[in-house]
Curated annotation (Swiss-Prot):
Domain S1 motif: start-end pairs: 30-96, 114-180, 201-269, 286-356, 373-443, 454-529
Any one of the GO CC terms: cytosolic small ribosomal subunit
Disulfide bonds: none
Family assignment from sequence similarity: Belongs to the bacterial ribosomal protein bS1 family.
Protein name, as recorded: Small ribosomal subunit protein bS1
Physiological role: Binds mRNA; thus facilitating recognition of the initiation point. It is needed to translate mRNA with a short Shine-Dalgarno (SD) purine-rich sequence.
Organism: Rhodopseudomonas palustris (strain ATCC BAA-98 / CGA009)
Biological process, per Gene Ontology: translation
Gene3D superfamilies: Nucleic acid-binding proteins
Domain of life: Bacteria
Family annotation (PROSITE patterns): S1
Keyword Repressor (UniProt): no
Entry comment on modification after translation: The initiator methionine may be removed.
UniProt-recorded Gene Ontology molecular function terms: mRNA binding; structural constituent of ribosome
Amino acid sequence: MASTDTYNPTRDDFAAMLDESFAGGNLQESSVIKGKVVAIEKDMAVIDVGLKTEGRVPLREFAGPGRDNEIKVGDTVEVFLDRIENALGEAVLSRDKARREESWGKLEKAFQNNEKVFGVIFNQVKGGFTVDLDGAVAFLPRSQVDIRPIRDVAPLMNNSQPFQILKMDRRRGNIVVSRRTVLEETRAEQRQELVQNLEEGQVIDGVVKNITDYGAFVDLGGIDGLLHVTDIAWRRVNHPTEVLTIGQTVKVKIIKINHETHRISLGMKQLLDDPWQGIEAKYPLNARFTGRVTNITDYGAFVELEPGIEGLIHVSEMSWTKKNMHPGKIVSTSQEVEVQVLEVDSVKRRISLGLKQTMRNPWEVFVEKHPVGSTVEGEVKNKTEFGLFLGLDGDVDGMVHLSDLDWKLPGEQVIDNFKKGDMVKAVVLDVDVEKERISLGVKQLEGDPFAEPGDVKKGAVVTCEVLDVKESGIDVQIVGTDFNTFIKRSELARDRNDQRSDRFAVGEKVDARVIQFDKKARKVQVSIKALEVAEEKEAIAQYGSSDSGATLGDILGTALKQRDK
């Protein structure tokens, strides 16, 4: 049988209660009032609030997460008066509503003053959790539970802890709180305190907490510092995992502290001597050293000369002849190579190295083996609009310009006689070692007809062979020479009626007089007309005079007979 606690009032108590009863007429529904526990029956508390009848409140309404729920007869409690009297003649009371009203007032004040409030997480709902704020129920979004996502929230349940109110609407009864904001604020305060105890230049032990592509975060005992990948070692570190592992204890030096953002920059290499000190003396210009290839890029290869000291071989300094080849096809990672120091910049911490400088310049070697004027043979590697490129000894190329293909024919015409892969002989005309150029000539394999023209000179009479007959004139070659020229129609005869190209046939030989021989312009011109005019003048001078009475025909006839004899 369930026990029942009963409160037996004294005569004075009855008098006081009678006074309160008369005062009960001033009580209003939907307000918070005080009452006294007069009995506890099973799971109900009987409360006298000074009305005609007592009200009953479930004991569970006095319980709650994080609260002592034991009440006893004689306790004074605050309850919410829902109705003065129900159908059974009893006062309708609620402890929950009283607490909620009281709590909302406190919460609104805390919200306005941006103060923390205490509550208990007691249930999980969609998207988050419900929190009891001393009678008022608030919503805690999952994203506001902690600074980082957590899987197990059980340890956080049913424990009184601080929260920050993010927003609240009393009319709708909505309250949203955050535990994360409180943690962040607490952490910021802790960070501030920790930062105050740290100094730039201080050496401290830490634990590697996280590793990224750009560095590692090190826990310094409640506050993290960033160890950038460039500050791990003096040598090149492509990724922090080459040196560090999560959980590893490392000794670091505090490089910089930003007291506003609480960011701390750390360094490991700063604990060691700077290998770049006195670098110019260690690696003088043009000196040669052996190093190891550590990294290859599109623009060159990095070579480690000693721990912490690397230099770059630019792609342009890798080979004398392999101009457009990727560095990875010339050297390989970890390969030992001999390099020459080209430039040292201690301020920017850069060393420029050369690989090709450790080998002889192939153009110097070529000119030693093949001086200007010597004959070489090479394979046609390319044909362009301005000449031929021949592959020569020493993996160098030489160019035959169009103008150096033939003495007589235009280069644009002659170049069609060559194709890729042909082996061609040529004369070395010039070697420019600095510009890495070799000039060759094919026509120079034969003598220059203008250099040794023989009897061909201006005014000389020459015999020509007809090569081609055209309406505008005839193409001829001076017999016994390499001179080809064109006799235009006006120069075919002295008499206008005889200036016809159809008078001549291919293979026919004709005499003509040289009227132009220009070595500089490389031009020779002959004329049959000029020869006839000269012969006419000579005949008149030799066989006739102005007063002889002989006709021009008689004089020429006599001259021709004399020549034939």
